């Protein structure tokens, strides 16, 4: 689409373009914040504060240590650490050493870990001690030469660290004996000084990150992301919040940092504006998360709908035991944000919860609802500054479509990745040349429509279309209908094999605590709101649904389980 109907609907103070973008590496934001706000907290973890001056120094020393271990510009270095100060130290240390960050999901299975180690070719990885044995088991047959190991107690306040060592370290698997060749991170930091940091001229087009996709469609692929991509998206997100106060904000860092969303919209954004990061290593521990909100009064809280919904329904929150009024702005991503979740959370906090959209191939945001302006129900919002979008026909993949027509979202912008690591065929199908010779277009695989104001709406994933008896059925539409049922807490919908229709619709439901729901009630609810061919023919009630670490329901896992059960009969 040549015009940009969304521009008139931007909030006051949000520019149409940020060009020209600064030509600096991502870690320059940390150095700038350390110069502007040296004594401001950078991370807060269980009461232990690391200031921006200290974080800059620690990451310099980490860079020196990595260089001394043989890390050269362009080398991939792994991180296998939850949301703790060590992640921030290591992340910026790798970048300052000229390395490429490869952040691994701590919940990955050994098979997934081995795949990522082999695919990325990393030779060194920094790992939290309680995950050490898992990496050692995955190490044989990979290029991984040595591990740098950190202990969670290293960044706890002294008394807490002592108690942790006495009462929990062995019990919870944090105490380990290192194999020959592996090293303690704390020893390396003590051994090196910031002055030893390698003197490198890291360029914007240098690779900063191999961001592996969440693996919702199979083994993950590594998206090659440059410093320029990450710097641009950090600034795009900053521009979207013109009321943000430099050097004063506090970010609740509950979304995983190994995920592009947490890494950019959480950490990189916060560091760029001198915000404090309140580190939450396990967001499923709602008591700990709520205690952090109560104590440290965060103003920014990037998250996912399942997390906001869990807070809304927590009995202590309902009883008014926690003060959530400090929260001003929350960008929700990774899954659809239901209106009920949004309204309840905004009533609890007095802040604004608004939905955005992004992907690992454009880390991390390309669209967002406005902070001040109208948020439209079911919409992912408008393109961020400098993001161009087209909606292309599902029939030929070429013909541009207009307002409220449904097709594949295709986009380009300064945050778009450079391709998949060692996967030229997948790169060529995802990044396609522009007929006019401009920057290539990213084919997202998401089916969308755009309204007359330039707000976009996700219809579904192209690959998850259900073809039932010749009809096209989008799972998300059915999920939204079922999620609106007052007794339904979570829902997943997918196509399963059917001898007569080819595929048929199945729904998996989690019922709210204390409620009961029957299959007949579910079908009656859908029958009033959906065409007959869209109504689920099979219903399964479950206590929980399989999800990615950022709360996205794994439809393919539900289908796999269904097929296994069917085959066993």
Residue ranges and their predicted role:
Residues 275, 295-303, 314-375, 388, ...:
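Gly/Ser/Thr-rich phosphate-binding loop
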Residues 390-410, 452-453, 515-519, 554:
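Conserved beta-loop-beta connector loops within the AMP-binding
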Residues 8, 134-204, 315:
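ANL superfamily adenylate-forming
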Residues 66-71, 192-205, 210-253, 275, ...:
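Conserved adenylate-forming
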Residues 382-386, 397-433, 473:
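Conserved ATP/PPi-binding loop(s) of AMP-dependent carboxylate-activating enzymes
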Residues 108, 127, 294, 413, ...:
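AMP-binding/adenylate-forming catalytic core of the ANL superfamily
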Residues 20-22, 31, 39-84, 88-92, ...:
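Conserved AMP-binding/adenylate-forming core of the ANL superfamily
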Residues 231-250, 260-299, 310, 314-317:
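Conserved AMP-binding/adenylation subdomain of ANL enzymes
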């Amino acid at each position: 689409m040549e015009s940009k109907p969304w521009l008139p609907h931007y909030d006051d103070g949000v520019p149409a373009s940020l060009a020209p973008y600064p030509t600096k590496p991502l870690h320059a934001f940390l150095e700038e914040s350390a110069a502007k706000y040296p004594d401001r907290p950078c991370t807060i973890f269980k009461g232990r504060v690391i200031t921006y001056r200290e974080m800059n120094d620690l990451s310099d020393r980490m860079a020196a240590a990595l260089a001394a271990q043989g890390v050269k510009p362009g080398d991939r270095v792994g991180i296998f650490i939850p949301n703790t100060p060590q992640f921030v130290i290591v992340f910026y240390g790798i970048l300052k050493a000229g390395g490429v960050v490869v952040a691994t999901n701590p919940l990955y299975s050994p098979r997934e870990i081995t795949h990522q180690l082999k695919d990325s070719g990393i030779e060194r990885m920094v790992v939290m001690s309680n995950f050490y044995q898992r990496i050692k088991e995955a190490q044989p047959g990979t290029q991984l030469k040595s591990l740098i190991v950190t202990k969670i107690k290293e960044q706890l306040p002294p008394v807490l660290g002592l108690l942790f060592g006495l009462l929990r370290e062995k019990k919870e698997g944090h105490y380990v004996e290192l194999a020959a060749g592996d090293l303690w991170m704390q020893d390396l930091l003590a051994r090196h000084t910031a002055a030893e940091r390698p003197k490198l001229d890291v360029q914007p087009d240098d690779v900063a990150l191999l961001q592996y996709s969440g693996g919702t469609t199979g083994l993950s692929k590594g998206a090659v992301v440059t410093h320029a991509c990450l710097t641009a998206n950090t600034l795009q997100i900053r521009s979207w919040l013109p009321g943000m106060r430099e050097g004063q904000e506090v970010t609740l860092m509950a979304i995983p940092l190994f995920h592009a969303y947490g890494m950019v919209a959480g950490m990189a954004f916060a560091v760029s504006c001198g915000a404090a990061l309140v580190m939450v290593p396990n967001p499923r521990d709602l008591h700990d998360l709520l205690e952090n909100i109560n104590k440290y009064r965060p103003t920014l809280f990037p998250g996912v709908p399942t997390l906001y919904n869990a807070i809304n329904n927590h009995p202590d929150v309902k009883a008014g035991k926690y003060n959530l009024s400090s929260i001003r702005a929350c960008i929700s991503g990774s899954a659809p944000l239901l209106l009920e979740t949004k309204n309840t959370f905004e009533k609890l906090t007095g802040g604004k919860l608004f939905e955005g959209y992004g992907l690992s191939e454009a880390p991390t945001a390309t669209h967002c609802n406005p902070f001040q302006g109208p948020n439209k129900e079911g919409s992912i919002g408008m393109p961020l500054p400098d993001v161009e979008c087209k909606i292309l026909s599902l029939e030929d993949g070429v013909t541009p479509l207009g307002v409220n027509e449904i097709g594949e979202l295709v986009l380009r912008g300064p945050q778009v990745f450079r391709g998949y690591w060692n996967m030229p065929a997948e790169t060529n199908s995802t990044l396609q040349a522009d007929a006019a010779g401009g920057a290539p277009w990213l084919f997202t695989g998401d089916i969308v429509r755009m309204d007359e104001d330039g707000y976009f709406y996700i219809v579904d994933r192209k690959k998850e279309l259900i073809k039932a008896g010749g009809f096209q059925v989008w799972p998300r539409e059915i999920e939204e209908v079922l999620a609106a049922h007052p007794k339904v807490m979570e829902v997943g919908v997918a196509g399963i094999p059917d001898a007569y229709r080819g595929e048929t619709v199945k729904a998996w439901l989690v019922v709210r605590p204390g409620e009961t729901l029957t299959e007949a009630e579910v079908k009656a609810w859908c029958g009033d709101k959906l065409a007959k061919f869209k109504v689920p023919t099979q219903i399964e009630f479950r206590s929980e649904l399989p999800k990615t670490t950022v709360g996205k329901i794994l439809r393919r896992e539900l289908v796999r389980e269904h097929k296994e059960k069917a085959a066993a009969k």
